[in-house]
Amino acid sequence: MKASQILAAAAARVGPALRKQVLTLTDEAASRVHHLLQQRQKPFLRLGVKARGCNGLSYTLNYADEKGKFDELVEEKGVRILVEPKALMHVIGTKMDFVDDKLRSEFVFINPNSQGQCGCGESFMTTSTSSAKQSAS
């Protein structure tokens, strides 16, 4: 048996590799995104990251009419969110929630890649962000 046949047989037994989900939404987040998209009559919400704040990165959310060539599409609980390519490595595995109480009404991101965030919670840092900062020094 050739090596390629052995590998093919092993792959067939194991099945496809599980891919970590880019983004998951709580019911509250999905409900709020659905409301916002209906209100603006837009098909997508686009999630990105922007360099700002004392810890390096901040999340951005914008309405979108179409999927960009390299955007990652997340369809969950009846809503569609596009993740910008440059944000992908910083947000993979993140859970998006929505908090609405007497003090605030905002989306909250529970990010397993976060290596720290500033005191006010406006910005965060991932391993990729901290590596880039150290390289620039």
UniProtKB/Swiss-Prot annotation:
This is Iron-sulfur assembly protein IscA-like 1, mitochondrial. One of its GO terms (molecular function) is metal ion binding. PANTHER family: IRON-SULFUR CLUSTER ASSEMBLY 1 HOMOLOG, MITOCHONDRIAL (PTHR10072:SF41), IRON-SULFUR CLUSTER ASSEMBLY PROTEIN (PTHR10072). Coiled coil: none annotated. Its cofactor is Fe cation. Residues 1-33 form a transit peptide. Involved in the assembly of mitochondrial iron-sulfur proteins. Probably involved in the binding of an intermediate of Fe/S cluster assembly. It comes from Arabidopsis thaliana (Mouse-ear cress). Pfam families: Fe-S_biosyn.
